[in-house]
Structure formats: structure tokens, C-alpha cells
Regions:
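Active-site-proximal beta-strand/loop segments in catalytic clefts of secreted hydrolases
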Residues: 120, 161, 288-290
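An aromatic- and glycine-enriched ligand-binding surface/loop that stacks and positions planar moieties
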Residues: 21-82, 156, 180, 188-189, ...
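Conserved, well-structured interaction surfaces
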Residues: 39, 43-57, 79-153, 167-203
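Secondary-structure transition into beta-strands, especially the periplasmic turns and strand N-termini
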Residues: 5, 17-19, 124-139, 245-253
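Short, well-structured active-site flanking segments
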Residues: 25, 150-161
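Bacterial Sec-dependent N-terminal signal peptides
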Residues: 1-28
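Short helix/strand-bridging catalytic loops that position acidic/His residues to coordinate divalent metals
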Residues: 164-171, 202, 232-239
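Short linear capping/connector segments at secondary-structure termini
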Residues: 28-32, 91-94, 160-167
């Protein structure tokens, strides 16, 4: 019995030492508590806030749903009949994936921005100017995501703190007027307190600049002056006039910051296909950037051109067809409406017509 007791004690002691060793491991998962130590980590997290822009549910693929309210294009093409249901036809349901996925993406971006702003002060060795720039970019992106929410849904849940648990997630909606005030305040303040000028960024529009904030502010004021904002209330003529004047004010700031239209309508398209910025006119103020080719861990390549671009065959098995391996292919799912077609034709604008509406498709010889 004594030997048995000694053995049990020895085993317990052994398990105790093993348990202590096991529990003393360094954390292997990233959390706000063990992250935000260096400027590099802060930059990486900020990139994650930007990354929402390139998701397939946003500019990476479904952006055409955001312009579905106009009458310039319709879904069809490549052997498909015109669409008759869904958001693109203005008869979506609450279960439409294009609706729910966009909603989730926007709130994911907002939550990331909230986490970033709550933890940025933990970073050591930060250059003060860089820190201000990062904070301004995060604030702008959060406001931009809220702008997309009120554009699409009006009154929406509103929060400026990150989600810490799975409880208390049913937040009541906030009046869109209050959210508009927040959007404008955040964007204007970001432009003045941290964002770099477009010239300081060498007019590379992948990064948010003062011009970005001013340009989007002009859009916000124009949208706020419309029926969507005034729904449910009577705006005075003075209010509407002020919104349009503010839109003009910010648009003028962009125009005097070194931006102008390219000499040729097609220049930005050629530059984009050449994977370079248009620096001859700095026409592009802000771009959602993409990377990767869908074959690696970096899969943020986007497919807008693949969906709305020139119809062509799958050349993925070909090499050097256009000077490079796998030049890709296009579905041409989005077709021009007769209205847009006639706008070009009736104005005799054949050059822009041929670059905007392809009256042909590419077939492999």
C-alpha cells in the first residue's frame, strides 16, 4: 500500500509538472491583447480594413448591384436571358445573398475599424505623423462603410465600439440623419488631421488621400440632398441649397489638388490593363486595389472586368496568346440598355461608345 501511495504521488507530481509546462505556452492566436505591438502590425491591421473593398461582395465582384437602380445596364448576355429577379431587378428579398453578403461585409469593415481605433495607442515606436495618417484612414473607411449602409438601407444599426461578445447584438436602428452627420464629420476631420495630400502620395490612388475624402464628401452631400435623405421629413429650400453648395465646395477642392480628366477617354482603361497608375492627368482619385491570381494565398484579384467586360473564351490553358500566360476570359454578363446605346449614337460619340459598349466579342481562331 505504501508503494502504491508513493507511485500515485509521483504520478501526480509528474502530471503537475507536465500541466504547468503545457499551460505556460505562448499564445498562438492573434487577439487585441497580444497584437498592436509594432507599426508593422498596425499597418497590417489597417490593410485588413481596406481589404473589405476588394471582397467579392463589394468592388471585387458584385459592385454592379450597387448601380442596379439606374437604367443604363441589365443582366444577361453570353447565352443567358435577361434577369427577372434579384437586387439587380429591384425586386430582391431579404434572403438575397447579394443583400446579406454586402451588409455583413460593411459591418465587418466597421468592426475592424473600431478595433483598430481602440488599440492603436498600444503601438510602440510609432512616428507621430504616420500614426495620425493611419487613424485618419481608419476613420474615413469606417465612415465610408456607413455611407454605403445608409445609401442602401437608410436607418441602420450604428456603433463606434467593437463587438466584444456574442450577446447584445440586436442593436436598434439609428436615424440616418444622425449617421450622415457622423459620416461628414469623420471624413472632413480625417482630411484635416491626418490624411496626406494626393501629391504627397505621388498621386497613387490606392491609398486614401485628402482628395479621396473631399471627393467622397461631395458625393455624400449630393446624395444627402436627394429624395432618399428627405424621406419622411420636409427639408427646407435652404437646407437643400446648402447641401449642393457643400458638394460644389468639396468638388472644387479636388479639382485644385492636381486632378483633371485624362486627355483621352481610353487612357485610364489602357493604364489599368497595363497595371499602372494614370499619372498624366491624375484622373483617378481613389481605387480599390487588387492582387493575386486566385491560385495562391493572396486572392484579392477582383473580377469586375471578367463579369462586365468583353466576351471571350476561356484561355486559361493557353500561353502567350497576348504576350502573357493565361490572359483570362470575360463573361459579358452586363449588357447596355437601349437608352445608353442611343445616348452615345444620337450624340455621335463613336469613340467613347466603342470603349464603353463592345459591339463584338472575341473568338479563338
Amino acid at each position: 500500500m505504501k508503494a502504491l501511495k508513493i507511485t500515485i504521488i509521483a504520478l501526480l507530481a509528474g502530471f503537475s509538472m507536465v500541466s504547468c509546462d503545457f499551460l505556460d505556452k505562448e499564445p498562438t492566436k492573434l487577439t487585441p491583447e497580444n497584437y498592436f505591438n509594432t507599426p508593422a502590425e498596425a499597418n497590417s491591421f489597417l490593410t485588413g480594413i481596406y481589404a473589405i473593398l476588394s471582397q467579392p461582395t463589394f468592388y471585387g465582384g458584385d459592385y454592379m448591384y450597387l448601380v442596379a437602380g439606374d437604367d443604363l445596364s441589365h443582366y444577361g448576355g453570353s447565352g443567358r436571358g435577361p434577369a427577372s429577379t434579384g437586387l439587380i431587378c429591384n425586386n430582391a428579398t431579404t434572403s438575397d445573398n447579394a443583400v446579406t453578403a454586402f451588409w455583413y461585409a460593411l459591418y465587418s469593415g466597421i468592426n475592424r475599424a473600431n478595433m483598430f481605433l481602440e488599440n492603436i495607442d498600444k503601438v510602440n515606436g510609432f512616428d507621430a505623423g504616420v500614426k495620425e495618417q493611419y487613424i485618419a484612414e481608419a476613420r474615413f473607411l469606417r465612415a465610408f462603410y456607413y455611407f454605403n449602409l445608409v445609401e442602401c438601407w437608410g436607418d441602420v444599426p450604428f456603433k463606434t465600439v467593437s463587438t466584444q461578445s456574442v450577446t447584445n447584438l440586436n442593436i436598434p436602428r439609428t436615424d440616418k440623419q444622425e449617421i450622415y452627420d457622423f459620416i461628414i464629420s469623420e471624413m472632413a476631420d480625417a482630411a484635416e488631421t491626418g490624411l496626406k495630400s494626393a501629391s504627397d502620395l505621388a498621386y497613387k490612388p490606392g491609398r486614401i488621400s485628402q482628395s479621396t475624402a473631399w471627393g467622397i464628401l461631395a458625393r455624400v452631400y449630393l446624395f444627402r440632398a436627394g429624395e432618399h435623405y428627405r424621406e419622411g421629413r420636409n427639408a427646407t429650400q435652404a437646407e437643400k441649397k446648402d447641401y449642393f453648395e457643400r458638394a460644389s465646395f468639396y468638388a472644387q477642392k479636388v479639382m485644385t489638388a492636381g486632378h483633371k480628366l485624362a486627355a483621352n477617354y481610353w487612357d485610364p482603361f489602357i493604364d489599368m490593363c497595363s497595371d499602372k497608375y494614370n499619372t498624366t492627368a491624375n484622373e483617378s482619385i481613389w481605387e480599390a486595389e487588387f492582387a493575386g491570381n486566385n491560385t495562391s494565398d493572396t486572392q484579392a484579384e477582383g473580377r469586375i472586368g471578367n463579369i462586365i467586360g468583353l466576351a471571350g473564351p476561356d484561355l486559361s490553358s493557353k500561353s502567350d496568346v497576348t504576350g502573357a500566360k493565361d490572359p483570362g476570359y470575360g463573361y459579358a454578363f452586363i449588357y447596355s440598355t437601349p437608352k445608353l446605346y442611343n445616348l452615345y449614337v444620337n450624340n455621335g460619340d463613336t469613340k467613347r461608345f466603342n470603349w464603353s459598349i463592345a459591339p463584338f466579342e472575341y473568338k479563338e481562331a
